[in-house]
């Protein structure tokens, strides 16, 4: 199972990489733009933050296949080993096929249906990213879509992985993992919600109180 952070905040990645068992970091144009740091500056810093074994994801901006391929090559040259995110449009599928032949790994992004995700996998995407909460927001069932996509990939494109994205709660992420997803990417707030429950801190404080009352110290 692979756990990613969905952010371009270098300081937060450095802080959380010490704590969480991270496989890497995912970004998108909106995330990069929010940080107001040029993509060619922030990507090397993110790669350094996650270390040489971490995987970094960044997205193309072009709308046509040839433009996507050229941008993917630039990203790959700038950060060797990067996985290039390609929106799963008609042109995006063409780009994924071309990049597969070039040996550049891709992630099919902006996936709103199981059929769309399956096409990306069959075209050669290493990862496929269904948007869970965004599907829910449009009146659909994001978790069911992920379940269907996971089953389809297991049957017809086992070399590709579902990397579920777009979460608002830890429950959504856990449901995707229960559906068999091999990878998820979490925004910072959801990642921290997985640990930050008041009941945990309350339990620790009770342990400390009992220990201190008995032994007059908080050390072993």
Swiss-Prot record:
Q: Which Pfam families match?
A: TAL_FSA
A GO BP annotation:
fructose metabolic process
Q: Which CDD domains match?
A: Transaldolase_FSA
Q: Name one GO molecular function term.
A: fructose 6-phosphate aldolase activity
Q: Which GO terms describe its cellular component?
A: cytoplasm
The annotated active site, in chain numbering, is 85
Q: Which reaction does it catalyse?
A: beta-D-fructose 6-phosphate = dihydroxyacetone + D-glyceraldehyde 3-phosphate
Q: Which UniProt keywords apply?
A: Carbohydrate metabolism, Cytoplasm, Lyase, Schiff base
Its annotated compartments are:
Cytoplasm
What Enzyme Commission number(s) appear in the record?
Answer: 4.1.2.-
Keyword Lyase found: yes
Which top-rank group of organisms is this from? Bacteria
Assembly and oligomerization: Homodecamer.
Give the record's family classification. Belongs to the transaldolase family. Type 3A subfamily.
Q: What does this protein do?
A: Catalyzes the reversible formation of fructose 6-phosphate from dihydroxyacetone and D-glyceraldehyde 3-phosphate via an aldolization reaction.
Protein name in the entry: Fructose-6-phosphate aldolase
Origin species: Klebsiella pneumoniae (strain 342)
Organism lineage = Bacteria, Pseudomonadati, Pseudomonadota, Gammaproteobacteria, Enterobacterales
Gene designation per UniProt: fsa
